[in-house]
Amino acid sequence: MTDQNSASQGLMGRRGLLKSALGGTALAAMGAAVPQTHAAEKGEVNGNIRQSIVFWCFNAAGDKWDIEKTAQVAKSLGCQSVELVDPSQWGTLKKHGLVCAIAPNGMPGAPFMKGFNNPRYHEEVITRTKSAIDACADAGFPSVIAFTGFKWRDADDPSSGEIPQEEGFDNCVKGLKQVAGYAEKKGVTICLEHLNTRDDTHPMKGHPGYQGDDVDAVADMLRRVGSPRVKMLFDIYHVQIMNGDVIRRLGQHMDIIGHVHTAGNPGRGELDENQEIQYPAIMRKLVELNYDGYVGQEFIPTRDPLEGLTQAVTLCDV
C-alpha cells in the first residue's frame, strides 16, 4: 500500500507532466490542487468545507481499505468524517476523533432499490430508518440516508409495472411524514438522495430505474414533507449527469440540501483533469451560501487511492 510520501511524489510527478502538456496557466485553471498537496497530507486545511470520505468507495475498490485504514487517512488529510459506515464500526471512527456524517439506513442489499416511493416497503424502510436514527442520536451523528427507490411495483422485477412519478412522490411524502416527527424529536436529519439513471455501465455509476432522478422534482417533493429534518443529499456527480447547471441549482435548492457528495464525471472517478466538473467553483458557492453540512468524497478510485483523495481534498479546500 502506498504511503503518504510516495503519494506526494506521484502527485508532483503528475504536476510536471501536466505543466509540460498544458502549461502552468492550464494547471492553475484546474484548481491548482497539486502545489497544495503537502498541506492536505498534514491535515492542514482551511476548514471552510467540512469534508468526509465515503467508506464504500475505498473499501470496495482500489486497495480495499478497511475502516481503520480509511479513518487513518481521513484524519491525516484533515477530513472530519468517514461516512456510510455500519454502526458496528463507529467505535473506530470515534477513536480517531471522527464522525459518521451520514449513516446507512440499514436496508439489506442495494439500499437504493426499495424506498419511500413504494408502500409495500414502507414498514421495513421506516422501521430501519428509525433504528438508524436512534443509533445516530446515541452517537451524536447528524444524519441518515434515504432513497425514493426503484419505480417498479416490485423493485426486483422490472416487468412488474411502473409506479408513475406523481404517485411515487406522493408515496414518498406520506412515508417520510411518518418518520419526520421521530427525526425531529431525535435531532437527526433524513437526507434523501437524487441519483442518475443515464449511466448503465456500472452498478454504482448509475441506477436505471431509480425514481428520484430529477433533482428539481426531488427537491419539490421533499419541501412538501415540511420538516426541517427531511432534506436532500445533493450528489454533484448525479446532478451534473441528469440536470447540470450545478452552481445555480445549489442556490435554488440550498433550503433543502442537507448533505453533498462529489465524484468526477464522466466515470465517477477522481476529481482530476480528466473530468468536467469545476469543483473549486462549486465549493466556493457552497461557502458563499453558508452551507455548513458535510461534503463526502464519493469517487471510485482508478489509481492510487491516497493520491486521488489527497488531490480531491485539496481541490475542495477553498
How would you describe each model-predicted region?
Residues 2-76, 141-142, 155-156, 202-203, ...:
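Histidine-acidic metal/acid-base catalytic patches
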Residues 21-31, 41-43, 115-231, 241:
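Active-site acidic/histidine proton-transfer and metal-coordination neighborhood
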Residues 54-64, 112-124:
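Active-site mouth loops of central-metabolism enzymes
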Residues 79-85:
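Short, hydrophobic beta-strand segments that form beta-sheet elements in well-ordered domains
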Residues 90-93:
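Active-site-adjacent beta->alpha loops and helix N-cap segments on the catalytic face
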Residues 99-108:
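Short hydrophobic/aromatic-enriched beta-strand-loop microsegments
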